[in-house]
């Protein structure tokens, strides 16, 4: 009974074994060549997708740089436009040959209002603390401390106004502060 369970290749002739192995090898070679072709195609597709994504990223970066460049170049344009009427008023004032002190004062006041309005439209806000207001080191710069008949560490006087732009200090207000008694 042991001979009936024997391996069929053991009973086959060497030529038959070689033919079977060659057929098996040919099938395996065909399968591997097909798999290799599929993997090469997938690799080429992924390489193409990578190159396209890389090119798109480069285009996005370049467009962003262009936008930033334009924003820097033209961002101040509206601010400059809002100051042009102030320049016009100053030119007109200088063109007057025989102005009285009252006229000069009125013109200066009107020009200052124009300038203040232009600054406010561009989110530049004046820091001008009132006397007696609590000293705030974030908004004020103390130039000196003076004896005063008011609470200590409060503003006595403003020597120079300060300015904020969009909640950022451009210049703190220069103030004198009441010293402790």
Curated annotation (Swiss-Prot):
Gene3D superfamilies: 3.90.20.20, Head domain of nucleotide exchange factor GrpE
Keywords (A to Z) from UniProt: Chaperone, Cytoplasm, Stress response
Assembly, per entry: Homodimer.
Keyword set includes Cytoplasm: yes
Domain of life where this protein originates: Bacteria
General function of this protein: Participates actively in the response to hyperosmotic and heat shock by preventing the aggregation of stress-denatured proteins, in association with DnaK and GrpE. It is the nucleotide exchange factor for DnaK and may function as a thermosensor. Unfolded proteins bind initially to DnaJ; upon interaction with the DnaJ-bound protein, DnaK hydrolyzes its bound ATP, resulting in the formation of a stable complex. GrpE releases ADP from DnaK; ATP binding to DnaK triggers the release of the substrate protein, thus completing the reaction cycle.
MF (Gene Ontology): adenyl-nucleotide exchange factor activity; protein homodimerization activity; protein-folding chaperone binding; unfolded protein binding
One protein family per Pfam: GrpE
A GO cellular component annotation in the UniProt record: cytosol
Cellular localization per UniProt: Cytoplasm
InterPro entries linked: GrpE, GrpE_coiled_coil, GrpE_head
Record family assignment: Belongs to the GrpE family.
Protein's name in the database: Protein GrpE
Originating organism: Delftia acidovorans (strain DSM 14801 / SPH-1)
PANTHER family, sorted: GRPE PROTEIN, GRPE PROTEIN HOMOLOG, MITOCHONDRIAL
GO biological process: protein folding
């Amino acid at each position: 009974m042991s001979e009936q369970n024997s391996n069929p290749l053991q009973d086959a002739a060497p030529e038959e074994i070689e033919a079977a192995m060659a057929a098996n090898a040919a099938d395996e070679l065909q399968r591997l060549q097909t798999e290799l072709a599929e993997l090469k195609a997938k690799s080429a597709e992924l390489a193409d997708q990578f190159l396209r994504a890389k090119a798109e990223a480069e285009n996005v970066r370049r467009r962003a740089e262009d936008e930033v460049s334009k924003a820097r170049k033209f961002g101040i344009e509206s601010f400059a436009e809002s100051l042009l009427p102030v320049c016009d008023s100053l030119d007109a004032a200088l063109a007057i040959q025989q102005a009285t002190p009252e006229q000069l004062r009125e013109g200066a006041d009107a020009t200052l209002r124009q300038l203040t309005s232009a600054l406010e439209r561009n989110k530049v806000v004046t820091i001008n603390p009132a006397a007696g207001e609590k000293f705030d080191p974030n908004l004020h710069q103390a130039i000196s401390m003076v004896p005063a008949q008011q609470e200590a560490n409060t503003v006595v006087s403003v020597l120079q106004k300060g300015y904020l732009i969009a909640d950022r200090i451009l210049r703190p207000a220069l103030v004198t502060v009441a010293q402790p008694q």
